Amino acid sequence: MSHINRTIKPFELNAFRYGAEDFYTVSEKDVMGKWSVFFFYPADFTFVCPTELEDLASNYDHFLKLGVEIYSVSTDSHWTHKAWHEKSDAVGTVRFPMLSDDQFKLSKQFKVLRPN
């Protein structure tokens, strides 16, 4: 799903990023006027998602050279992102921000949330 040239509504999500001193927040202000890829996945500690995250991680430098930031997004907490990053060899390669959409704001905005 493409949201090129669309305005993103205000949001503020907690984030984990390997190498950052602490958790931090990412908002629409951080992505305004910049190329960004939001990669949504269902949940941390699943069997399929690490493969896709590892693939994005292996191409991360290419995206950065093009001026594109990658954000992975799930409804798990930023603490869970950190724990998964520490536990999984594949997810441990991720250097881009892992956003916690635990209130479903961004997932609903991008229309990727599947209600249970």
Please identify what each model-predicted range represents.
Residues 1-116:
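Chalcogenol-based redox active-site neighborhoods
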